């Protein structure tokens, strides 16, 4: 195209001093003036447009070819390509013809005649005459594009070329946009200063382990089959060329060279090296030193992003043993939920960061620093909430429990006997913050942790528990957390407590005297063996000197939840604790000592895998007391119930209703995970010392008077303490008026407690279950 432009107006383009715009206008005026054209193209629409354009630009169309024609326009591109050079002047015709001449080739006469005939047939007579006369031959497409370029209006993008002040018109270069087709590789510059590098492939390169003399990233080229004649010629040429030497590979594992990689990999020497586990010991040691932030998901955990975000707040939990019962002095109705958090990156928990006591951080009690590095610990976040009070939590603490998978795998999918020793929970003076001391039955002592409890009163502030004490004081009331075995049956069906055997723990759960103020005459706690499962026991009151207790656990069945395997089981169990308080508990009578009965219903979810044991137990506790003996001698040791009522620092939670031995009227059946009344079975009632005898049942007026004697001198009555004593009934049915039988007498004797009667009201009436309860609530809230 450039040659066409230079030929058509060569003398005009040589003037470089004129500006481009003026130069283009002048070219349009004198481009084809005085020029003659001969068109060697078929008659069509393009020929008509070309004839009109040449006429507008001042050119002349000749009808016959002659020596006076300046340009010959042809539609054959081969004829234009065969022309060696284009002459710009007629005086150079002889030089062009001399340049086209070739040296003669010696050939026979017959070949020369054949070439002449072929040449005459291929070449047109018009083009042959034009070449012989020195006329310029142009291709029709080049002429059309050139004319369109001349007739195009000037562009508006005129910019200054130089900074000296000379104006120059220029057009912006057009950007070439290409769309890459996969497979391709594109490398871009982040600063956008350099153009990107791209490379497209017909097929993406693949690793090749067959070729030994090439890179494994190079694709293997398939050999195309050729004709036999061509193969003979190539074989003759290959015989003359020296063959390239084949390169050999080197195996660093075997430290030897090989000719073919595929043959070496299946060889005996290399297979012996790979089969030896010590060959890669150095690599394993280096990999063991690296830290890995990834953690294995527990069995049955969700994999979706939404489920993972929701499961970050509640992970798989270690469980409390089925059946936890607490005394009335420390909030009998509580829902205990243990939430397990994850280990740190190294798989261990730091003693300094986990809030361990001072004697553990200072290096006491059986080398805890060494075990802290050896035993993997799991951070257990314990949140205990009141079942019926939703305004504030009762207990919030943090414990550390060992990973039971450190010693071995769990050999059974069912929860076996516990491996826990005694666990002591103590309240200090002036606060209700207990301290948890946990220990495994295999001799490993766990790390102590601080337990913080928020009192129920709004004015009181939570205080941290002091960890300086090592022995429990005998004067302060305390609770004992004992180990309890679990009876399991893989049967289905039934209700809570209807199936399963009963296991007595009167001898197996005796605590050590060095950790708890209990003078027990029975056998010491035996070391359990077998399963590595971990379970926490029920909470029962500490007995006085000479006291005894009977702890029975009933477990109905195991169930497999929907969408899970046999590794995830669901257990329902009920634990009943019967304790005799007082020094003469070995010969109990209804007139001598009070009787304490605690029931607990729990649902346990167990997840047994090859690496860890995790479960969650939701327990509901219920505690009741018989009336105290009015003829107790002054020299006798006060019982736990009397110490509890006399303690002014013990805060009690509000209750919606009390879970007595018989269900209250109008109570709807609920699941075992909620606050539900439990009825003792006949086999357990037969075991009571006072079974079959007439027992004097307390009434609320007597209980309030008896409770008020502790603070009669001060003129105040602890309403929260009185509300913790439940109402016992032997009748299976009662009316709503029976619940309010003793309310007037209570208000007459205690007029100062009118503003605090919410505890008594919520302990007697289920407010959310009847219209009668709502009306009673409105009446009792008015001031007298």
Swiss-Prot record:
The keyword Isomerase does not apply. One of its GO terms (biological process) is regulation of cell cycle phase transition. Its main location: nucleus. Keywords: Cell cycle, Developmental protein, Metal-binding, Nucleus, Phosphoprotein, Zinc, Zinc-finger. Zn(2+) binds at residues 251, 254, 264, 270. It is found in: Nucleus. PROSITE patterns: ZF_DBF4. Residues 498-507 have a biased composition (Polar residues). One of its GO terms (molecular function) is zinc ion binding. It comes from Xenopus laevis. This is Protein DBF4 homolog B. GO terms for cellular component: Dbf4-dependent protein kinase complex. Forms a complex with cdc7. Regulatory subunit for cdc7 which activates its kinase activity thereby playing a central role in DNA replication and cell proliferation. Specifically required during the initiation of DNA replication in egg and during early embryonic development. The complex cdc7-dbf4b phosphorylates mcm2 and mcm4 subunits and is required for cdc45 loading. A zinc finger (DBF4-type) spans 244-293. Residues 222-243, 299-332, 348-368, 495-529 are annotated as: Disordered. Gene3D superfamilies: DBF zinc finger. It comes from the Eukaryota. Residues 27-117 form the BRCT domain.
């Amino acid at each position: 195209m450039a040659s066409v432009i230079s030929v058509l107006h060569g003398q005009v383009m040589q003037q470089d001093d004129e500006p481009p715009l003026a130069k283009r206008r002048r070219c349009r005026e004198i481009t084809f003036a005085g020029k003659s054209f001969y068109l060697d193209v078929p008659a069509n629409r393009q020929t008509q447009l070309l004839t009109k354009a040449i006429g507008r630009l001042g050119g002349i169309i000749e009808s016959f070819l002659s020596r006076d024609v300046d340009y010959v326009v042809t539609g054959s591109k081969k004829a234009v390509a065969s022309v060696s050079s284009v002459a710009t002047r007629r005086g150079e015709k002889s030089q062009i013809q001399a340049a086209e001449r070739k040296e003669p080739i010696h050939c026979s006469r017959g070949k020369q005649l054949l070439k002449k005939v072929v040449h005459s047939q291929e070449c047109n007579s018009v083009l042959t005459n034009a070449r012989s006369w020195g006329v310029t031959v142009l291709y029709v497409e080049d002429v059309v594009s050139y004319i369109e370029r001349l007739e195009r209006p000037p562009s508006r993008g005129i910019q200054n070329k130089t900074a000296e002040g000379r104006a120059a018109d220029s057009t912006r270069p057009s950007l070439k946009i290409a769309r890459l087709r996969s497979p391709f590789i594109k490398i871009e510059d982040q600063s956008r200063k350099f153009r990107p590098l791209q490379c497209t492939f017909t097929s993406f390169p693949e690793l090749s382990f067959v070729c030994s003399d090439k890179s494994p990233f190079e694709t293997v080229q398939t050999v195309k089959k050729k004709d036999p004649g061509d193969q003979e010629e190539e074989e003759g040429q290959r015989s003359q060329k020296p063959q390239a030497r084949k390169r050999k590979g080197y195996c660093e594992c075997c430290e030897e060279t090989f000719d073919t990689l595929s043959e070496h990999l299946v060889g005996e020497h290399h297979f012996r090296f790979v089969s030896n586990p010590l060959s890669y010991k150095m690599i394993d040691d280096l990999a063991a030193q690296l830290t890995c932030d990834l953690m294995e998901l527990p069995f049955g955990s969700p994999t979706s992003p939404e489920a993972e975000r929701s499961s970050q707040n509640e992970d798989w939990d270690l469980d409390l043993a089925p059946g936890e019962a607490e005394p009335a002095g420390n909030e009998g109705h509580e829902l205990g939920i243990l939430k397990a958090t994850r280990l740190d990156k190294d798989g261990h928990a730091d003693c300094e960061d986990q809030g361990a006591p001072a004697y553990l951080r200072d290096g006491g009690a059986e080398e805890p620093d060494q075990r802290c590095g050896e035993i993997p610990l799991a951070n257990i976040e314990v949140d205990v909430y009141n079942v019926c009070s939703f305004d504030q939590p009762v207990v919030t603490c943090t414990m550390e429990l060992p990973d039971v998978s450190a010693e071995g795998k769990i050999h059974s999918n069912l929860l076996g006997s516990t491996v826990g020793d005694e666990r002591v929970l103590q309240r200090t003076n002036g606060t209700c913050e207990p301290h948890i001391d946990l220990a495994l039955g295999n001799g490993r002592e766990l790390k102590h942790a601080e337990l913080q409890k928020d009192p129920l009163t709004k004015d009181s502030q939570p205080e941290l528990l002091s960890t300086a004490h090592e022995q429990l004081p005998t004067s302060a009331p305390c609770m004992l957390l004992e180990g309890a075995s679990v009876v399991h049956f893989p049967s289905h069906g039934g209700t809570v407590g209807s199936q399963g055997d009963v296991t007595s723990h009167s001898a197996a759960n005796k605590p050590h005297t060095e950790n708890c103020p209990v003078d027990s005459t029975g056998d010491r706690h035996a070391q359990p063996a077998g399963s590595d499962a971990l379970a926490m026991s029920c909470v029962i009151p500490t007995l006085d000197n000479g006291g005894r207790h009977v702890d029975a656990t009933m477990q109905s069945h195991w169930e497999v939840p929907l969408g899970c395997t046999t590794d995830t089981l669901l257990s329902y169990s009920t634990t009943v604790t019967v304790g005799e308080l007082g020094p003469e508990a070995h010969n109990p009578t209804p007139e001598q000592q009070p009787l304490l009965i605690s029931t607990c219903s729990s649902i346990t979810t167990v997840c047994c895998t090859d690496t860890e044991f995790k479960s969650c137990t939701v327990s509901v506790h219920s505690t009741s007391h018989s009336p105290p003996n009015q003829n107790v001698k002054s020299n006798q040791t006060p019982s736990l119930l009397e110490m509890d009522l006399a303690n002014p620092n013990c805060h009690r939670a509000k209750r919606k209703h009390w879970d007595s031995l018989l269900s209250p009227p109008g109570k709807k059946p609920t699941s075992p995970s909620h606050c539900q009344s439990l009825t003792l079975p006949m086999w357990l009632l037969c075991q009571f010392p006072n079974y079959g005898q007439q027992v004097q049942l307390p009434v609320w007026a007597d209980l309030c008077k008896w409770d008020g004697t502790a603070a009669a001198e001060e003129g105040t009555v602890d309403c929260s303490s009185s509300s913790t004593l439940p109402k016992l009934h032997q009748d299976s049915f009662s009316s709503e008026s029976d619940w309010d039988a003793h309310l007037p007498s209570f208000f007459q004797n205690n007029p100062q407690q009118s503003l605090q009667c919410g505890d008594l009201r919520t302990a007697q009436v289920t407010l959310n279950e009847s219209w009668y309860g709502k009306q009673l609530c409105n009446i009792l809230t008015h001031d007298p």
